[in-house]
Curated annotation (Swiss-Prot):
Cross-link annotation Glycyl lysine isopeptide (Lys-Gly) (interchain with G-Cter in SUMO), location: K15, K133
Protein name as it appears in the record: Homeobox protein MSX-1
DNA-binding stretch(es), residue numbering of this chain: 172-231
UniProt source species: Macaca mulatta (Rhesus macaque)
Pfam families to which the protein is assigned, alphabetical: Homeodomain
Biological process annotations from GO: activation of meiosis; anterior/posterior pattern specification; BMP signaling pathway; bone morphogenesis; cartilage morphogenesis; cell morphogenesis; cell surface receptor signaling pathway involved in heart development; embryonic forelimb morphogenesis
SMART domains membership: HOX (SM00389)
Subcellular location: Nucleus
Gene it is expressed from: MSX1
Amino acid sequence: MAPAADMTSLPLGVKVEDSAFGKPAGGGAGQAPSAAAATAAAMGADEEGAKPKVSPSLLPFSVEALMADHRKPGAKESALAPSEGAQAAGGPAQPLGVPPGSLGAPDAPSSPRPLGHFSVGGLLKLPEDALVKAESPEKPERTPWMQSPRFSPPPARRLSPPACTLRKHKTNRKPRTPFTTAQLLALERKFRQKQYLSIAERAEFSSSLSLTETQVKIWFQNRRAKAKRLQEAELEKLKMAAKPMLPPAAFGLSFPLGGPAAVAAAAGASLYGASGPFQRAALPVAPVGLYTAHVGYSMYHLT
Protein backbone atom coordinates (compact mmCIF):
# COMPACT_ATOMS: atom_id res chain seq x y z
CA MET A 1 0.00 0.00 0.00
CA ALA A 2 3.09 2.26 0.15
CA PRO A 3 2.87 3.28 -3.54
CA ALA A 4 -0.74 4.30 -3.15
CA ALA A 5 0.13 6.53 -0.20
CA ASP A 6 2.84 8.30 -2.22
CA MET A 7 0.42 9.06 -5.07
CA THR A 8 -2.20 10.61 -2.77
CA SER A 9 0.35 12.80 -0.98
CA LEU A 10 1.47 14.56 -4.24
CA PRO A 11 -0.45 17.57 -5.48
CA LEU A 12 -2.66 17.44 -8.54
CA GLY A 13 -0.87 17.85 -11.88
CA VAL A 14 2.52 16.50 -10.74
CA LYS A 15 3.98 13.68 -12.75
CA VAL A 16 4.85 10.77 -10.55
CA GLU A 17 8.12 9.19 -11.54
CA ASP A 18 8.06 6.46 -8.95
CA SER A 19 5.24 4.00 -9.09
CA ALA A 20 4.64 0.59 -7.75
CA PHE A 21 5.96 -0.93 -10.97
CA GLY A 22 8.94 1.45 -11.49
CA LYS A 23 10.13 1.67 -7.86
CA PRO A 24 13.72 0.37 -7.35
CA ALA A 25 14.35 -2.74 -5.33
CA GLY A 26 16.00 -0.90 -2.45
CA GLY A 27 13.27 0.81 -0.41
CA GLY A 28 15.52 3.23 1.52
CA ALA A 29 17.50 4.48 -1.48
CA GLY A 30 14.36 5.46 -3.44
CA GLN A 31 12.89 7.76 -0.77
CA ALA A 32 15.25 10.71 -1.50
CA PRO A 33 14.55 11.05 -5.27
CA SER A 34 10.80 10.95 -4.72
CA ALA A 35 10.93 13.83 -2.25
CA ALA A 36 12.99 16.01 -4.67
CA ALA A 37 10.58 15.36 -7.48
CA ALA A 38 7.69 16.34 -5.25
CA THR A 39 9.26 19.71 -4.35
CA ALA A 40 10.03 20.50 -8.04
CA ALA A 41 6.47 19.73 -9.02
CA ALA A 42 5.13 21.98 -6.28
CA MET A 43 7.29 24.92 -7.48
CA GLY A 44 6.10 24.46 -11.09
CA ALA A 45 2.51 24.49 -9.90
CA ASP A 46 3.07 27.75 -8.00
CA GLU A 47 4.57 29.44 -11.12
CA GLU A 48 1.65 28.37 -13.27
CA GLY A 49 -0.79 29.65 -10.69
CA ALA A 50 0.97 33.03 -10.57
CA LYS A 51 0.38 33.60 -14.34
CA PRO A 52 -2.89 35.47 -15.17
CA LYS A 53 -5.50 33.18 -16.59
CA VAL A 54 -7.40 34.72 -19.51
CA SER A 55 -10.88 33.46 -20.07
CA PRO A 56 -11.44 32.35 -23.67
CA SER A 57 -14.68 34.34 -23.72
CA LEU A 58 -12.71 37.63 -23.54
CA LEU A 59 -10.80 36.92 -26.75
CA PRO A 60 -12.67 38.30 -29.77
CA PHE A 61 -11.12 35.73 -32.11
CA SER A 62 -11.80 32.67 -29.95
CA VAL A 63 -14.07 29.91 -31.13
CA GLU A 64 -16.70 30.76 -28.51
CA ALA A 65 -16.75 34.46 -29.51
CA LEU A 66 -17.06 33.64 -33.21
CA MET A 67 -19.82 31.08 -32.71
CA ALA A 68 -21.79 33.22 -30.26
CA ASP A 69 -24.11 35.94 -31.57
CA HIS A 70 -23.04 38.51 -28.95
CA ARG A 71 -20.91 38.68 -25.85
CA LYS A 72 -22.16 38.01 -22.41
CA PRO A 73 -23.04 41.11 -20.38
CA GLY A 74 -20.59 40.12 -17.63
CA ALA A 75 -17.70 39.75 -20.02
CA LYS A 76 -18.47 43.10 -21.61
CA GLU A 77 -18.49 44.88 -18.25
CA SER A 78 -15.27 43.17 -17.14
CA ALA A 79 -13.57 44.13 -20.40
CA LEU A 80 -14.66 47.77 -20.20
CA ALA A 81 -13.89 48.23 -16.47
CA PRO A 82 -10.07 48.35 -16.81
CA SER A 83 -10.28 50.81 -19.70
CA GLU A 84 -12.48 53.20 -17.69
CA GLY A 85 -10.02 53.08 -14.78
CA ALA A 86 -7.10 53.76 -17.09
CA GLN A 87 -8.86 56.74 -18.67
CA ALA A 88 -9.57 58.17 -15.21
CA ALA A 89 -5.87 57.81 -14.31
CA GLY A 90 -4.92 59.81 -17.38
CA GLY A 91 -3.51 57.19 -19.73
CA PRO A 92 -5.08 54.82 -22.24
CA ALA A 93 -5.18 51.25 -21.14
CA GLN A 94 -6.51 48.06 -22.68
CA PRO A 95 -7.61 44.83 -21.01
CA LEU A 96 -5.19 41.95 -20.86
CA GLY A 97 -5.32 39.57 -23.81
CA VAL A 98 -7.24 41.94 -26.09
CA PRO A 99 -5.35 43.26 -29.16
CA PRO A 100 -5.24 47.06 -29.59
CA GLY A 101 -8.06 48.52 -31.65
CA SER A 102 -10.33 45.51 -31.18
CA LEU A 103 -12.06 46.68 -28.02
CA GLY A 104 -15.69 47.40 -28.67
CA ALA A 105 -15.34 46.81 -32.42
CA PRO A 106 -17.93 44.00 -32.65
CA ASP A 107 -20.43 45.85 -30.48
CA ALA A 108 -20.05 49.32 -32.08
CA PRO A 109 -22.49 49.80 -34.96
CA SER A 110 -20.60 50.20 -38.20
CA SER A 111 -21.30 53.34 -40.22
CA PRO A 112 -23.45 52.57 -43.26
CA ARG A 113 -21.53 52.75 -46.53
CA PRO A 114 -23.09 54.67 -49.42
CA LEU A 115 -24.67 52.31 -51.89
CA GLY A 116 -24.12 52.89 -55.57
CA HIS A 117 -26.96 52.94 -58.09
CA PHE A 118 -25.57 49.92 -59.93
CA SER A 119 -24.50 47.80 -56.94
CA VAL A 120 -26.47 44.80 -55.74
CA GLY A 121 -27.29 46.47 -52.45
CA GLY A 122 -28.40 49.64 -54.19
CA LEU A 123 -30.73 47.73 -56.47
CA LEU A 124 -32.19 45.77 -53.57
CA LYS A 125 -32.76 48.93 -51.52
CA LEU A 126 -34.67 50.69 -54.29
CA PRO A 127 -38.45 50.70 -53.87
CA GLU A 128 -40.69 48.99 -56.37
CA ASP A 129 -42.19 52.29 -57.47
CA ALA A 130 -38.80 53.52 -58.63
CA LEU A 131 -38.18 50.36 -60.63
CA VAL A 132 -41.60 50.50 -62.27
CA LYS A 133 -41.17 54.19 -63.02
CA ALA A 134 -37.80 53.57 -64.63
CA GLU A 135 -39.32 50.96 -66.94
CA SER A 136 -42.41 53.00 -67.84
CA PRO A 137 -42.59 54.20 -71.49
CA GLU A 138 -43.49 57.71 -70.32
CA LYS A 139 -39.86 58.51 -69.59
CA PRO A 140 -38.85 61.39 -71.86
CA GLU A 141 -35.30 60.12 -72.35
CA ARG A 142 -36.45 57.04 -74.25
CA THR A 143 -36.57 57.27 -77.99
CA PRO A 144 -39.76 56.40 -79.95
CA TRP A 145 -38.26 53.28 -81.52
CA MET A 146 -37.50 51.88 -78.03
CA GLN A 147 -41.11 52.37 -76.95
CA SER A 148 -42.39 50.23 -79.80
CA PRO A 149 -42.70 46.53 -78.89
CA ARG A 150 -41.30 45.40 -82.24
CA PHE A 151 -38.49 47.96 -82.29
CA SER A 152 -39.80 49.40 -85.52
CA PRO A 153 -37.95 52.39 -86.99
CA PRO A 154 -39.30 55.81 -86.15
CA PRO A 155 -41.90 57.14 -88.57
CA ALA A 156 -40.52 59.41 -91.23
CA ARG A 157 -41.29 63.03 -90.77
CA ARG A 158 -43.65 64.47 -93.31
CA LEU A 159 -41.90 67.37 -94.88
CA SER A 160 -44.16 70.08 -96.12
CA PRO A 161 -43.68 70.90 -99.81
CA PRO A 162 -41.60 73.99 -100.39
CA ALA A 163 -43.58 77.09 -101.07
CA CYS A 164 -43.62 78.20 -104.67
CA THR A 165 -41.69 81.41 -104.91
CA LEU A 166 -43.37 83.76 -107.33
CA ARG A 167 -41.55 86.36 -109.29
CA LYS A 168 -41.64 89.63 -107.48
CA HIS A 169 -42.70 92.55 -109.60
CA LYS A 170 -41.92 96.12 -108.99
CA THR A 171 -44.23 97.94 -106.66
CA ASN A 172 -44.65 100.83 -109.09
CA ARG A 173 -45.39 98.57 -112.06
CA LYS A 174 -48.31 99.70 -114.16
CA PRO A 175 -51.15 97.25 -114.78
CA ARG A 176 -51.42 95.56 -118.14
CA THR A 177 -53.47 97.45 -120.67
CA PRO A 178 -56.52 95.48 -121.85
CA PHE A 179 -56.85 96.16 -125.57
CA THR A 180 -60.21 95.77 -127.24
CA THR A 181 -60.72 93.66 -130.34
CA ALA A 182 -61.05 96.71 -132.59
CA GLN A 183 -57.83 98.19 -131.23
CA LEU A 184 -55.93 94.90 -131.75
CA LEU A 185 -57.15 94.60 -135.36
CA ALA A 186 -56.13 98.19 -136.10
CA LEU A 187 -52.69 97.69 -134.52
CA GLU A 188 -52.12 94.48 -136.47
CA ARG A 189 -53.14 96.11 -139.73
CA LYS A 190 -50.82 99.03 -139.10
CA PHE A 191 -47.93 96.68 -138.22
CA ARG A 192 -48.28 94.84 -141.54
CA GLN A 193 -48.07 98.15 -143.35
CA LYS A 194 -45.15 99.54 -141.39
CA GLN A 195 -43.25 98.00 -138.48
CA TYR A 196 -41.59 101.24 -137.33
CA LEU A 197 -43.64 104.39 -136.80
CA SER A 198 -42.31 107.86 -136.59
CA ILE A 199 -43.15 110.17 -133.71
CA ALA A 200 -45.83 112.02 -135.73
CA GLU A 201 -47.37 108.83 -137.05
CA ARG A 202 -47.40 107.29 -133.56
CA ALA A 203 -49.08 110.37 -132.07
CA GLU A 204 -51.76 110.46 -134.76
CA PHE A 205 -52.38 106.69 -134.63
CA SER A 206 -52.59 106.59 -130.83
CA SER A 207 -55.11 109.45 -130.75
CA SER A 208 -57.30 107.68 -133.30
CA LEU A 209 -57.39 104.54 -131.10
CA SER A 210 -57.84 106.48 -127.83
CA LEU A 211 -54.49 105.15 -126.56
CA THR A 212 -51.36 106.79 -125.29
CA GLU A 213 -48.18 106.98 -127.31
CA THR A 214 -46.38 104.78 -124.74
CA GLN A 215 -48.96 102.01 -125.12
CA VAL A 216 -48.64 102.04 -128.92
CA LYS A 217 -44.84 102.11 -128.67
CA ILE A 218 -44.68 99.10 -126.31
CA TRP A 219 -47.17 97.11 -128.42
CA PHE A 220 -45.05 97.60 -131.54
CA GLN A 221 -41.91 96.54 -129.65
CA ASN A 222 -43.54 93.32 -128.47
CA ARG A 223 -44.95 92.64 -131.94
CA ARG A 224 -41.53 93.02 -133.56
CA ALA A 225 -40.00 90.54 -131.04
CA LYS A 226 -42.76 88.05 -131.81
CA ALA A 227 -42.22 88.41 -135.56
CA LYS A 228 -38.50 87.80 -135.06
CA ARG A 229 -39.14 84.56 -133.18
CA LEU A 230 -41.51 83.32 -135.89
CA GLN A 231 -38.98 84.13 -138.60
CA GLU A 232 -36.22 82.20 -136.81
CA ALA A 233 -38.51 79.17 -136.48
CA GLU A 234 -39.27 79.24 -140.24
CA LEU A 235 -35.59 79.39 -141.08
CA GLU A 236 -34.84 76.41 -138.86
CA LYS A 237 -37.60 74.45 -140.55
CA LEU A 238 -36.19 75.23 -144.00
CA LYS A 239 -32.73 74.09 -142.93
CA MET A 240 -34.09 70.77 -141.74
CA ALA A 241 -35.93 70.26 -145.04
CA ALA A 242 -32.86 71.09 -147.16
CA LYS A 243 -30.72 68.36 -145.57
CA PRO A 244 -30.59 65.18 -147.78
CA MET A 245 -31.80 61.89 -146.39
CA LEU A 246 -29.12 59.40 -145.36
CA PRO A 247 -28.60 56.47 -147.77
CA PRO A 248 -29.44 52.89 -146.67
CA ALA A 249 -25.72 52.04 -146.47
CA ALA A 250 -25.46 54.34 -143.47
CA PHE A 251 -27.74 51.97 -141.54
CA GLY A 252 -25.64 48.90 -142.48
CA LEU A 253 -27.93 47.73 -145.32
CA SER A 254 -26.19 47.39 -148.68
CA PHE A 255 -27.86 45.77 -151.68
CA PRO A 256 -25.99 44.77 -154.87
CA LEU A 257 -27.12 45.74 -158.32
CA GLY A 258 -30.40 44.08 -159.10
CA GLY A 259 -31.95 44.54 -155.68
CA PRO A 260 -33.31 41.79 -153.46
CA ALA A 261 -34.03 39.51 -156.45
CA ALA A 262 -30.34 39.40 -157.34
CA VAL A 263 -29.56 38.52 -153.75
CA ALA A 264 -32.02 35.59 -153.90
CA ALA A 265 -30.54 34.38 -157.21
CA ALA A 266 -27.04 34.47 -155.80
CA ALA A 267 -28.17 32.46 -152.81
CA GLY A 268 -29.77 29.82 -155.07
CA ALA A 269 -26.62 29.57 -157.19
CA SER A 270 -24.49 28.94 -154.18
CA LEU A 271 -26.94 26.32 -152.92
CA TYR A 272 -27.41 24.27 -156.12
CA GLY A 273 -24.17 25.12 -157.91
CA ALA A 274 -23.53 27.28 -160.96
CA SER A 275 -23.97 24.37 -163.43
CA GLY A 276 -27.14 22.99 -161.95
CA PRO A 277 -29.84 21.84 -164.42
CA PHE A 278 -32.62 23.65 -162.53
CA GLN A 279 -30.89 27.03 -162.44
CA ARG A 280 -32.90 29.90 -163.85
CA ALA A 281 -31.49 33.13 -165.11
CA ALA A 282 -32.40 36.08 -162.88
CA LEU A 283 -34.17 38.94 -164.55
CA PRO A 284 -32.50 42.31 -164.19
CA VAL A 285 -34.29 44.42 -161.64
CA ALA A 286 -33.99 48.14 -161.55
CA PRO A 287 -32.53 49.62 -158.39
CA VAL A 288 -35.04 50.58 -155.73
CA GLY A 289 -33.50 54.00 -155.26
CA LEU A 290 -34.67 55.12 -158.72
CA TYR A 291 -38.33 54.97 -157.72
CA THR A 292 -37.99 56.51 -154.28
CA ALA A 293 -38.85 60.15 -153.94
CA HIS A 294 -37.04 62.57 -151.71
CA VAL A 295 -38.81 62.49 -148.39
CA GLY A 296 -37.69 65.93 -147.33
CA TYR A 297 -38.95 67.43 -150.57
CA SER A 298 -42.41 65.90 -150.16
CA MET A 299 -42.58 67.05 -146.53
CA TYR A 300 -41.55 70.54 -147.56
CA HIS A 301 -44.38 70.73 -150.08
CA LEU A 302 -46.92 69.23 -147.66
CA THR A 303 -46.24 71.79 -144.98
